[in-house]
């Protein structure tokens, strides 16, 4: 079973490269911390497998908040580790703006049901 983490970023916000990098990092760290603090043994199994595999991370894009929310809701429905990132609003965008979501680490075939059709950022 191969695993991966996917971060889905909104492109309608016109964030700079550094801002996007920070938001993606927030999502990745948040996912790992959420799993470590969770009682979900399956998620922890996926996390440890992902760590053994070299922590594959993929960053993809969506054009809108609506599309991001659809992906988030589908990940929740499939009971995958999922996080949603809201910006603090200290630099480029308004406080509370949802910038990206993170999904996984989880089996590739499950994550691909949600993000497999999206283009790389």
UniProtKB/Swiss-Prot annotation:
The keyword Hydrolase applies. Its EC number is 3.1.1.29. It is found in: Cytoplasm. Belongs to the PTH2 family. GO terms for molecular function: peptidyl-tRNA hydrolase activity. This is Peptidyl-tRNA hydrolase. Keywords: Cytoplasm, Hydrolase. It catalyses: an N-acyl-L-alpha-aminoacyl-tRNA + H2O = an N-acyl-L-amino acid + a tRNA + H(+). It comes from the Archaea. The lineage of its organism: Archaea, Thermoproteota, Thermoprotei, Sulfolobales, Sulfolobaceae. It is an enzyme of class 3 (hydrolase). It holds the Pfam family PTH2. One of its GO terms (cellular component) is cytosol. PANTHER family: PEPTIDYL-TRNA HYDROLASE 2, PEPTIDYL-TRNA HYDROLASE 2, MITOCHONDRIAL. Transmembrane segments: none annotated. The gene is pth. The natural substrate for this enzyme may be peptidyl-tRNAs which drop off the ribosome during protein synthesis. Its main location: cytoplasm. One of its GO terms (biological process) is translation.
């Amino acid at each position: 079973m191969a695993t991966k983490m996917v971060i889905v970023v909104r492109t309608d916000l016109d964030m700079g490269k550094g801002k996007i990098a920070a938001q993606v990092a927030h999502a990745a760290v948040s996912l790992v911390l959420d799993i470590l603090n969770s009682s979900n043994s399956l998620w922890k199994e996926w996390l440890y497998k992902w760590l053994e595999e070299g922590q594959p991370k993929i960053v993809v894009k969506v054009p809108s908040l609506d599309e991001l929310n659809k992906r988030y809701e589908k990940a929740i429905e499939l009971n995958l580790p999922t996080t949603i990132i809201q910006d603090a609003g200290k630099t480029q965008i308004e406080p509370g703006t949802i910038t990206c979501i993170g999904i996984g680490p989880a089996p590739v075939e499950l994550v691909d049901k949600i993000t497999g059709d999206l283009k790389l950022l």
